[in-house]
UniProtKB/Swiss-Prot annotation:
ANK repeats: 2-32
PROSITE patterns assigned to the protein according to its UniProt record, in alphabetical order: ANK_REP_REGION, ANK_REPEAT
Pfam families: Ank
Keywords: ANK repeat
Superkingdom of origin: Bacteria
Protein name as it appears in the record: Putative ankyrin repeat protein RF_1157
Amino acid sequence: MYNTTPLNFAINQENNEEVIKYLLANGANPRLALVDIIEAGNNNALNLLMKVAPSITVDEVFPQVMAMGMRRFFQAVQNKDLSAIKDFI
């Protein structure tokens, strides 16, 4: 289970932007949530976080997403999981 921060929990529960903005305004750290969101592969949560947290940029997120994708690809190859490998093609 990821949801290690209140912000990440709120994002994963698909709360509206106002809830997310409230947490950010009251000291929530978007970078802590970012790590869990990327590891969970939750694209909707990632898009929402980038939309409401101006400090999170594509330049910051892209390398982490690529690294996670490569780890998943090599894991799929190691496990000989053809359906997972096809997702990358």
